[in-house]
A protein has these predicted regions:
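Conserved SET/PR-domain catalytic core that frames the SAM/AdoMet-binding pocket
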Residues: 14, 20, 28, 40, ...
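A short glycine-rich, His/Asp/Glu-containing loop-to-beta-strand
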Residues: 1-33, 39, 106-141
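Ligand-binding loop in jelly-roll beta-barrel domains
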Residues: 55-57, 71-100, 122, 174-183
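Short acidic-glycine-tyrosine-enriched beta hairpin
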Residues: 53-72, 110-113, 158-179
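Short, charged, solvent-exposed linker or helix-capping segments at domain edges/interfaces
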Residues: 100-106
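Short, charge-rich binding segments
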Residues: 31-35, 42-43, 58-61, 67-71, ...
Length: 183
């Protein structure tokens, strides 16, 4: 998998700390030490995972976003319960000192060629989308003095006139609205 950590902070309002695209082989466990206190978002892309933490377990399926508050120094274990299939999920950590209750919400990507908000709270908004080739959209964020991080799961995109291919991410700021085009 890939992991991206925030290095420096171009905007004071940006609290993005960690992004990871994680693959787990069949019947194995992926361990992760959390180094920053904050809100962790877990988004399975295919398969389901069992999350084991010191004081709780959770089972997270595809088409769900699970949110939990974690402290620095916490060890998380992600189990692939499938004996013959790999699983893949996204993990995003947003810095925060405010404890929030664990929650899981369902979403469905039933629209093509547009971004769909699958999670929002006072610190961040998470949008996912499926696009056909040569389709365009515009993303406008509501809060000023913030930044936007984009990551391409599969294919190629132009993100504000910058080429991104599978597994590449980009953080930009001071640009609103933002133009996206699937290639």
């Amino acid at each position: 998998g890939r992991e991206i950590r925030a290095i420096g902070n171009p905007k004071a309002a940006t609290s993005f700390e960690l992004f990871a695209d994680v693959f787990i082989n069949p019947a194995t466990v992926h361990s992760k030490w959390i180094t920053t206190t904050g809100t962790l978002l877990i988004v399975p892309l295919f398969g389901a995972i069992e999350l084991v933490q010191e004081d709780r377990d959770a089972f997270i399926h595809i088409n769900q976003v699970s949110k939990l508050w974690v402290k620095a120094g916490t060890k998380l274990q992600f189990k692939n319960i499938y004996p013959d299939h790999s699983v893949r999920f996204l993990m995003l950590l947003i810095k925060s000192d405010t404890a929030e209750p664990q929650s899981t919400v369902e979403y469905k990507l039933d629209m093509l060629n547009d971004l769909q908000e699958v999670h929002t709270d006072r610190s961040c908004s998470l949008n996912l989308g499926q696009f056909e080739g040569r389709e365009e959209t515009v993303y406008t964020y509501q809060r000023k003095d913030t930044s936007v991080f984009a990551y391409v799961l599969q294919g190629a995109f132009e993100f504000q006139n910058r080429l991104l291919e599978t597994g590449e991410g980009l953080c930009i700021w001071d640009q609103n609205p933002i133009e996206l085009e699937a290639l």
